[in-house]
Amino acid sequence: MQKAAKDYELDESLIYAVIRTESGFNADAQSDAGACGIMQVMPSSFEWLQQVRDCEGKYTEDDLFNPEICIDYGSYLLKYFLDFYGTETSAIAAYNAGFVVSDWLDNSDYSTDGVTLTDIPYPETKEYVERVTDAKAKYIELYYS
């Protein structure tokens, strides 16, 4: 996690919080939706990220169960969303729900400025953002303060 945090200029506590929320640190986790590994990366996202990173076909879906690979790609995806959306809340929401976050930001019911989410219409994603945010705060309190 330290390597990924350094490589992608991410707060370690954010990576820990996503892992805690996604898999409870279970490298063999697989969701009913098909997300794999310690950071629960979707195989379709993994394929897309390999294309984005110019390493298409380097890894297979099974490689998502390798914690080092999954943390690298999951962290890269988090950084991608942070850069794309500009706020941690939107990035965390996108990690869970994908690019639909763009629609929410364009809707005045969910964002007053097109940048900051004031509400999240998917209950699962809303709870997910709260859980990750709470876990991050706890990690900061326990290990970084």
Residue ranges and their predicted role:
Residues M1-S145:
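Catalytic glycan-binding domains that act on GlcNAc-containing polysaccharides
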